[in-house]
Amino acid sequence: MRVVRLAVAIITLLAMPACVPLASMNPLWDDAHMISEPALTGSWVSDSGDAILTVAELSGGRYRLTYVADDSASQYEVHTVRLEDQLYLDVYPDSDWIEKRLNGEAFQSLVLTHFFLRVVLEEDRLELAVMDDEALEKKLEQEGLDVPLLSWKDGLLLAASTDQVQKLVVHFADDPEVWGEPEAFHLCRAR
């Protein structure tokens, strides 16, 4: 039962508006592109009011993101990445949090993957868009781009190196079909 609740919490964040995020074996971030973005820290409430993101900085460019929606929570390690002029989040499940939730049950058999969010951050407003696996696959076919993707029953897995992942993300940086509809949040200020 714990595995089911954990899966529901993770799927809740991954399903942000309605697309399946592209899972990646390798990260988007590297030392050359990871940045600190202090404006991300704090508690963010979705414009719909049904989700809360809490972002706490761990160290230069690394954050802990807690996502709460529908009476379930999930926790992630996040790296902020700037590629050209665009900000992204590389989101990776917090392995300590997962292990605690599962009490060690079947933890070793889980394959944790990265997924990517395109970020628009303006003062007290945050928009996050997920890279959609099916939309990306269609675009790759249309453009004849050779990118290592593995199919599995729940979606696609990007098997590219970090350098290739960065080039792919930059190539589709402004494509709204690949990124899907962003979910908007506003910063919750203490009164």
List each model region and its residues:
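Bacterial N-terminal signal peptides that target proteins for export
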Residues: M1-A7
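C-terminal motif of bacterial Sec signal peptides marking the signal peptidase cleavage site
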Residues: A15-A18
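Calycin-type beta-barrel ligand-binding domains and close structural analogs
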Residues: V20-P38, D47-I52, A56-R191
